[in-house]
A protein has these predicted regions:
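Generic structural marker for isolated residues within well-ordered, non-membrane alpha-helices
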Residues: 95, 314, 365, 410-411
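Extended, charged amphipathic alpha-helical segments
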Residues: 202-341, 383
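Activation/maturation switch segments at domain boundaries
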Residues: 398-447
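Short coil/turn segments at secondary-structure boundaries
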Residues: 87, 110-112, 126-127, 260-267, ...
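Extended, regular secondary-structure scaffolds
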Residues: 112, 116, 122-228
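C-terminal amphipathic alpha-helical
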Residues: 34, 105-114, 119, 123-124, ...
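Extended, helix-rich architectural segments
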Residues: 1-138
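Generic detection of long, well-ordered alpha-helical segments
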Residues: 85-92, 101-105, 234, 238-245, ...
Length: 447
């Protein structure tokens, strides 16, 4: 008789135990392995993922993952950003110091990259008395942590388990079958599990130390690659790219081996009797017995058809990742508007990410202020680098006309291109450029 189990019959377990068991969950293990594989593909470590038919096959790989992921991560933090804070002067001054200490735009550029590769990145503010602001922001990508979800709000977490593999020498006297010494290495999982109440360190399944969490909350801000409904860890867009990249590598390897086989000119012999041999005269001819035949094996590898299919997969790869090929390899359009249309999918990615990252940065800022015991800020406006997203905008098409009609001024345009520049500095640069251009025009007229 089947047994019906009810949630009412089970014993409750602590949040720490839930986070501990989540680390050993099979699906969680596969998720982390996929995240690591995405990173390997991005950094060009792809040969180990190619399936070889035999030892005579050499893997051929082409790293398409890196340019596509890099393009998606070049949208937000391509230059130092201007941030407008709404809050108390003391809180704003402290945030600016912490951001300066941590080189925030460079750090968040890495956050963006690893969120694309692994699905999520946690930024963890920790105390560092060696820094002027005494806060260091530590990055953990989704291959380095597990989470115990909140049943009421699965988009949040009740616990975070920071994980790493610990290797320890347990026996240095081991000897292999050929007489060589082979030290025995034991690998265990080291976990630091954070809950609202405690911070517990595990080595394997043993508790090393457990301390109260004096903050009373989880000091982590979750930057997601792509938000997933009712999930704390986001989706890594690099997974789509990596899987198609894997198929392309496999096809390239097959083609390379086929060409290698074909260049060897395989010959098929038939009609031989027992004991008869083939005499080969290098560079001239082959002697075969009477009645026997020798034919060149036509492999018919259909190389061009295979290359066409690879090109099709490559095109689909760019399309499914919302990175138009023109944005990576370059290209021209008949007008700025045509280029805008072709770049539009990437522009939509920029808009969606900018909206989310503005929220993430707001959460990060207020978490830093909470840890420091300062008043939270009310609002944050980030001047994202829109000018670097498209090769040409409709405003650029009409810029000369707008200046002539006094809709905008050259000083406005200088400040748009460099938001850090004040109006006085922009005016000074305009006057300097105008003077230099006038001198060059006079020189050209004399010549």
């Amino acid at each position: 008789m089947p047994t019906n189990f009810s949630a009412w019959d089970s014993l409750p377990i602590s949040t720490t135990q839930r986070a501990f068991s989540e680390t050993y969950n099979l699906e969680e293990k596969e998720r982390k392995e996929a995240a690591d594989l995405n990173k390997n593909y991005y950094y060009g470590k792809q040969e180990g993922d190619v399936v070889l038919m035999n030892d005579d096959v050499n893997p051929i790989t082409m790293n398409i993952t890196k340019p596509i992921v890099s393009k998606r991560c070049s949208l937000l933090y391509s230059r130092p950003l201007v941030r407008e804070w709404d809050g108390s002067p003391r809180s704003i001054a402290y945030l600016e110091q912490v951001y300066k200490d941590n080189k925030i735009d460079s750090l968040l550029g890495k956050v963006d990259l690893y969120a694309e590769l692994t699905g999520s990145v946690l930024l963890h503010p920790t105390i560092d008395e060696n820094l002027p602001g005494q806060i260091r922001l530590v990055l953990y990508d989704a291959s380095e942590f597990s989470s115990a979800g909140n049943d009421d709000d699965p988009n949040t977490a009740d616990a975070i388990a920071l994980t790493r593999i610990l290797s320890r020498l347990v026996d240095s006297s081991g000897v292999t079958s050929d007489g060589r010494r082979q030290p025995q290495i034991e690998k265990t999982i080291l976990q630091q599990i954070w809950t609202n109440d405690a911070v517990t360190m595990y080595e394997g399944n043993q508790v090393v130390v457990s301390e109260p969490n004096e903050l009373g909350f989880l000091p982590f801000v979750n930057f997601q690659g792509e938000e997933v409904h009712n999930a704390y860890v986001g989706y890594p867009m690099a997974t789509i790219v990596r899987k198609l990249n894997s198929h392309i590598n496999q096809l390239l390897t097959h083609i390379g081996y086929t060409i290698k086989m074909q260049s060897g000119t395989p010959i098929v012999f038939s009609g031989f009797k027992s004991g008869e041999t083939v005499v080969v005269h290098p560079g001239r001819a082959i002697n075969i017995p009477e009645g026997a035949t020798a034919n060149v094996l036509n492999l018919d590898p259909k190389i061009q058809e295979s290359l066409d299919f690879i090109k099709y997969l490559e095109d689909r790869l760019y399309t499914t990742s919302s990175v138009p090929k023109i944005t990576v390899e370059g290209g021209e359009g008949r007008s700025g508007r045509e280029l805008m249309v072709r770049w539009f999918p990437l522009w939509k990615v920029f808009q969606e990410k900018a909206n989310r990252y503005n929220i993430y940065e707001m959460q990060l800022a207020n978490m830093i202020l909470t840890i420091a015991g300062l008043e939270p800020i009310n609002d944050l406006k980030i001047h994202w680098p829109e000018e670097s997203i498209l090769p040409l905008s409709s405003a650029d098409d009409n810029l000369e006309r707008d200046i002539k009609l006094n809709i905008v001024s050259p000083i406005d345009e200088i400040m748009r291109r460099d938001p850090h520049m004040s109006e006085i500095d922009a005016e000074a640069e305009y006057m300097l450029n105008a003077s230099q251009n006038a001198m060059l025009n006079q020189t050209n007229q004399v010549l």
